[in-house]
Amino acid sequence: MAIVLPSCGQKNNKKAQVADENASVVYFTKDISPDGLIKIYEALGVEAKGRVAVKISTGESMLSNHLRPELIGPLVKKVNANLVECNTAYAGNRQQTADHWKAIEEHGYTAIATVDIMDEEGEMKIPVKDDKWIKYDIVGSHLQNYDFMINLAHFKGHAMGGFGGVLKNASIGVASRNGKTYIHTAGKAEDYNQLWQNLPEGWMNSPENDTPFIESMSAAAQAVHEYFKGRNGIVYIDVMNNISIDCDCDGNPHEPTIQDIGIAASLDPVALDKFCLDQVFNLPNDENNDTKALLERINQRHGTHIVYRGEEAGLGTTKYTVVEL
């Protein structure tokens, strides 16, 4: 069960009061601004050292709800990072490198930082601990050029995963386009041209049928976590704004029906995504928040299972303590 410690009267106390020794700390602010983003990163107390990557979604189109350059630019500059992304497995504006570069420039990212499409020159395999479905994780080869990662995710819905947060950003996001296929097909195919005919059977029909994909995402996220744990580290940030039922990989997403919530960060990706899920599930369904469609999508796709699978595999814990800034 999630533990939430109220911050009333404790605005200046940045130290977590952990009520459960097994709980992870999640930092939270309602300030969705460049300054708020920097402050929540600093609250984590981990210095970005060496060659730093900030992993984002570059967004399928300007209609997508991806994180805008003006929001993330000051943080990226502060840590002297490259923005990193990989090509997509599905046909669209970002499957082919030349098209992806065009989208990156149109979306304004090259104006704020050096951008690296990590699978532009190939891919590599990194080990997984949870090998139930996938036996390795196929990531962009440029991942080896980085010592530290800030996983900067936009929390939203997703057509296949139910929702997308830092776990999806670490798994599908860091995977090459062939790696994305490998995860989506739960180990059945590695060629992005073979994606659609190898998806888990009946994945749209029941939450259970989508489980192989969900568990493969968890395994891939853990692989990336362990990779950077063996280097200088990795931290996780979820931005809860413009929350649509559709992912930023959708070029024509449904309009957001939920008010902006805030920014959350943690060293534990499982606890962080669980916190964000709890925020959405606990919202009142009223004139300010129409949560019905998003919650239905998450439940239909067995979306919440990813945090429990991650916990079972040792990636993190679903127990958390909140420190509000």
Regions of interest found by a model, annotated:
Residues V4-S7:
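C-terminal motif of bacterial Sec signal peptides marking the signal peptidase cleavage site
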Residues G9-K11:
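Bacterial signal peptide processing site
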Residues V18-L325:
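Extended, low-polarity segments enriched in aliphatic/aromatic residues
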